[in-house]
Amino acid sequence: MYFLVADHREHHVIPFLKTDFHHMHQNPIQKNQALLEIKQLFTGDYLICKSPSTILACIERKTYKDFAASLKDGRYQNRQKMLLLREQTKCQLYFFVEGPAFPNPQKKINHVAYASIITAMTHLMVRDHIFIIQTKNEAHSSQKLMQLFYAFSKEMVCVVPTSLTPTDEELCIKLWSSLSGISGVIGKIMANTCSVAHLVSGKLPSQNIDQLKTPSNRPFPKKVKRMLINISKGNKELEIKLLSGVPNIGKKLAAEILKDHALLFFLNQPVECLANIQIIQKTRTIKLGMKRAEAIHYFLNWCGSARVTVDSQNITEASRPIMQPATMQLATTQPLHKVSDEASENASHDASENASDKVSSPTGHQTISKYISKEISLNTAAK
């Protein structure tokens, strides 16, 4: 069963919600279900939940005036609570911004230009990946809540575990797709047609490349055919792109590996030879290492259910290399957006406060009991 939890301080919207849910109760199937609950919420104004205690979405409602005030007094940083909730429950986050549509950008709302409010809303979407829904008034907000609630109750919400390991085929498709012009569809065909080692060794004749077709029986694009033929002839730039598609091997590392030799040279050598390659970094020189070397040999020789081997030194299916975590990569990637020191401190403070209360549900979501109060105090301060 799905249900909506509304914060008891949402006095202006709750009457409309009660009316809207009353109409929903006319449905015989939902007649005896308590779809709307009014409680005190500590994060957000509304929670869309699934029985027994799974949080699917958290919604914060603000008028333009409230939004402007939050920018001035610092309550805008309260979004960290919502971000922490999403981290713990994998729920979706929404901001309802209430007010007339498209006012003049220079119009002052609570002494804040509307253009500044739009900028803050854009940052919420781009930086924090929070959905923004604009509404006209309280009644319209209630309607949008009902639409959102109905969509969640009818759609299967599937949360993919972040630790899900991709299959060999998926990784090999990604490898082929590192080449410009090769889509996931063509990448899958290549992954199950030949190995990279097969191509760079010239064992896939150009006439065979010319006969490759898509699932719709159309020939490969001419650009892709020329690129595959150039790889078979030892084009170093394309070899670097292919090698960079191997897990934990980026473009810089691939270029360093192929600095003095072609890709085929390493595929014809024992794995130990590749593992001993010296990689020059800014302050030191390191070896490529056995794990990366095994990954290179494994994925460049992978072909469908049966890999095409170049020599007896290649590793077997049973010894598939364990992918190194992101922290072990040679070239680390900086986050797209850096969180401010103040926001980080707020998030850390919230995380430490919530750590002792954290209880995981069997599905991997957090229970909602920590985000609502069992008893509502009549003296609770208004938002």
UniProtKB/Swiss-Prot annotation:
It comes from the Viruses. Its EC number is 3.1.4.-. Coiled coil: none annotated. It is an enzyme of class 3 (hydrolase). Residues 3-101 form the ERCC4 domain. GO terms for biological process: DNA catabolic process; double-strand break repair via break-induced replication; symbiont-mediated suppression of host innate immune response; symbiont-mediated suppression of host type I interferon-mediated signaling pathway. Induction: Expressed in the late phase of the viral replicative cycle. InterPro entries: ERCC4_domain, Mus81, Restrct_endonuc-II-like. Residues 357-367 have a biased composition (Polar residues). GO terms for molecular function: 3'-flap endonuclease activity; crossover junction DNA endonuclease activity; DNA binding. Residues 336-367 are annotated as: Disordered. Keywords: Host-virus interaction, Hydrolase, Inhibition of host innate immune response by virus, Inhibition of host interferon signaling pathway by virus, Interferon antiviral system evasion, Late protein, Viral immunoevasion. Plays a role in the inhibition of type I interferon signaling pathway. Mechanistically, specifically interacts with 2',3'-cGAMP and cleaves it via its phosphodiesterase activity. In turn, prevents 2',3'-cGAMP interaction with host ER-resident STING1 leading to inhibition of downstream signaling pathway and type I interferon production. This is ERCC4 domain-containing protein EP364R. It comes from African swine fever virus (isolate Tick/Malawi/Lil 20-1/1983).
